[in-house]
Regions:
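Small cysteine-rich, disulfide-bonded extracellular modules of the LU/uPAR three-finger superfamily
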Residues: 1-83, 87-98, 151-181
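Tryptophan-rich substrate-binding surfaces of secreted polymer-degrading and adhesive proteins
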Residues: 98-152
Length: 181
C-alpha cells in the first residue's frame, strides 16, 4: 500500500494522540525486549516525563520531538542501548538509542553510537578513527581500534550514551518517519 503525505502525516499524528500527553520515557542498558508487550529488560538508566505536547505536528511524512526531553539526574550508571515510552504502566513504543559517533574517542564494549542513519554496537572496545566512523549494515566494522556491528536504524540520539548515576541526560533528536510514498 502506498499513501499520500497527508495520510502518512495523519498516521504519525495519531500515534501521539493514542499515547496521550506527558508520557514517560525510560532509557535502559541491556538487550531490547522482543516487543512492547514483554517486561522491561536491563537497568533503567534515566526516567523523564515528556512535555504535554511531546511531538511536533507531522510534516512531509516525518514527526520530530517537541520541547526539551531531559532527566536532571540519571537513575543509574550504564550504557544506553534502548528506550521505552509509556502511558501509565503501558509500554507503547520501544527502540534503539545511542550517542552520535565522534572521532578519536574511546568507546566501551556494547556502547551504542549513531553514525549517519544507523545505530552500531561496539564489539571490541577501543578508540575510534579521527574521521569517518562505522558505516554499512554488517558486522566486524573496523574504526580505529574499535570494532562495530550494525544494530538497526537511527531512532533516538542522546547527548551521552555512557551514563553515570546522577548525570543530566538529554535527548538530542527523536523522529518518526512514515514511508510508502
Amino acid at each position: 500500500m502506498q499513501a499520500s503525505a497527508t495520510v502518512r502525516n495523519a498516521l504519525l499524528d495519531a500515534i501521539e494522540t493514542a499515547i496521550g500527553v506527558s508520557p514517560t520515557l525510560k532509557i535502559f542498558d541491556g538487550a531490547m525486549p522482543a516487543n512492547v508487550g514483554v517486561a522491561d529488560a536491563g537497568t533503567v538508566l534515566a526516567t523523564m516525563t515528556l512535555p504535554s505536547d511531546w511531538m511536533a505536528a507531522a510534516s512531509a511524512a516525518a514527526k520530530a520531538k517537541s520541547g526539551t526531553w531531559q532527566d536532571a539526574g540519571a537513575d543509574a550508571s550504564g550504557l544506553a542501548r534502548y528506550y521505552r515510552l509509556y502511558a501509565g504502566a503501558t509500554c507503547h513504543l520501544q527502540g534503539l538509542c545511542g550517542q552520535n559517533w565522534a572521532g578519536s574517542t574511546a568507546y566501551s564494549l556494547n556502547q551504542h553510537v549513531v553514525n549517519g542513519n544507523n545505530v552500531y554496537k561496539c564489539t571490541t572496545a577501543g578508540t575510534s578513527a579521527s574521521s569517518g566512523g562505522p558505516t554499512g549494515t554488517g558486522t566486524g566494522i573496523t574504526d580505529g581500534t574499535c570494532v562495530w556491528d550494525y544494530v538497526g536504524p537511527k531512532e533516538m540520539v542522546l547527548d551521552n550514551g555512557n551514563i553515570a548515576a546522577g548525570q543530566q541526560i538529554t535527548v538530542n533528536t527523536y523522529q518518526w518517519n512514515a514511508g510508502n510514498a
